[in-house]
């Protein structure tokens, strides 16, 4: 006889309901710490469950999925579709309703990639977040410079360019002389706008507090860049290990 399991996953608990064609076989509430999840897997295996269903609730489903994945086929269900199905009553527990839907074949699972792809996606999302963080911090850094009336960003193509970074590094070391800062700017920029204009743009009113803030923001940006580059290297390494032919074709 076919046995299925519905999981109602919360931040601090997982409610389990195991069903077959005759009705409820087992119900219990488990904790979310790994030993509890492993005990839950043992119960699921003891009852001969062949399919487990759970809702994609925030990130709480992910560790539950990882623990169960080596043992039983799973189905990740969109909560919207579960709630749209007719027949659910207010007094029916969520786990039992999920199990019922799985047993009757009323829902299909969302796409959950294999573990290798999940790892690559984690790195990819991290790189995306770090790039966003870098852009945000560059904006804050330029705002800190504008507060000091350092207007170099008006004359460079991007605040991520080398000249801008060199000027910021000099200020972070405590250098505020316009002539000294001018030497950090690429000659092409100076020639395009004129040395007097760039020198004026670098003549600011900089306090020791400004220097500290600029230095800290610069360090945060560099740290984010190092983390981004590390993630990219790890991602490249996994791609070359797992998909050598495809990876070679992209080089």
Language-model features: locations:
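A detector of single, family-specific signature residues
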Residues: 1-251
């Amino acid at each position: 006889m076919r046995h299925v399991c519905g999981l109602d996953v919360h931040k601090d608990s997982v409610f389990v309901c195991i069903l077959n064609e005759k009705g409820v076989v087992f119900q219990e509430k488990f904790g979310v710490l790994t030993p509890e999840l492993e005990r839950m897997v043992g119960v699921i295996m003891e009852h001969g469950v062949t399919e487990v269903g759970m809702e994609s609730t925030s990130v709480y489903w992910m560790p539950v999925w990882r623990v169960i994945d080596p043992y039983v086929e799973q189905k990740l269900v969109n909560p919207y579709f579960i709630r749209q199905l007719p027949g659910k009553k207010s007094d029916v527990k969520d786990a039992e309703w999920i199990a019922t839907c799985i047993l009757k074949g009323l829902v299909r699972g969302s796409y959950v990639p294999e573990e290798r792809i999940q790892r690559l996606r984690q790195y990819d999302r991290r790189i995306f977040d770090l790039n966003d963080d870098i852009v945000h911090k560059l904006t804050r850094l330029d705002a800190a410079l504008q507060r000091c009336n350092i207007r170099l960003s008006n004359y460079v193509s991007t605040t991520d360019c080398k000249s801008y970074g060199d000027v910021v590094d000099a200020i972070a070391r405590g250098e505020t002389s316009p002539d000294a800062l001018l030497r950090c700017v690429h000659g092409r920029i100076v020639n395009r706008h004129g040395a007097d204009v760039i020198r004026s743009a670098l003549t600011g009113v900089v306090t020791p507090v400004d220097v500290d803030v600029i230095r800290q923001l610069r360090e945060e940006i560099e740290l984010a860049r190092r983390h981004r580059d590390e993630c990219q290297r790890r991602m490249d390494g996994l791609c070359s290990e797992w998909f050598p032919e495809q990876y070679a074709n992209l080089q």
